[in-house]
Amino acid sequence: MTSALHFTPNDEANALLATEPLALLIGFALDQQVPVQTAFTGPLKIKQRVGTLDAHMLATTDLEPAFREKPAVHRFPGTMAKRVQELAAVVDEDYGGHAERVWTDAKDGADLRKRIADLPGFGEMKIKALGAVLAKRFDVELAQDLVPNHPTLGDVDSAQALEEYQSKKRAHKAEMRAKRQA
């Protein structure tokens, strides 16, 4: 078990991601069309602005004002506020408000995959990335089957490792764009 992840330059945000399972899920939900650092600082901003990361409270609160407050939580505040609210509702209704039950109550790797896939905003890439973080940073044995062969956030164990991961990811995206244009 880790005491902090290294997805942001903010120690408080990193500690929150490691100690509050809903923060981790929210960070992954926000991780699209913004830098990793922005996405994973989002849960701390939400907690500071709303006062809690309680799933029931987030599911029943209009989060858009908190998302729009400067600096915005995400570049698409309305859409992502709704996504986080939907995610919190699933955690509240299906897991009794305990986000960690997504993985602690899973019967096997296939069940864990389904549980993650059923979360709002979680497609195949996020299933693998969250699986890698759960397996490599939180020692969740059932998540081993979800770990892809390529580097993911699960491999990030320091600020330098995050920088290297992002550099490789940018190079890979550029290579893919070049192939599409050829």
What residues fall within each predicted segment?
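Short, aromatic/basic-rich helix-turn unit that serves as a nucleic-acid recognition element
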Residues: 25-29
